[in-house]
């Protein structure tokens, strides 16, 4: 299984409505194991991440007002991509692991962009 990255909006009654994803759009936020081995890892936590480490214990719901801060966190991880790849568990080569993380960060960034555009939130589950 893999983690899914989705964009949601709040309905007038407060319920979350997950937006439809266009067919063919890849929305993986990483493998299920990445909840603890990458996003929730001690290394990612040591960088000051506070959103993605939530995945170690639960699904991540980033409300609209927190999306800009989440965007900064993802930008921090991207800026330290080589270190994140080296500092987290990997079943593949370092280069493959780095490429996988980069791809997942790009997917998360695209969802953040959409959320900012429409005033929505980001869900990773």
Where are these regions (language model features)?
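Acidic (Asp/Glu-rich) sequence patches and key acidic residues
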Residues: 1-125
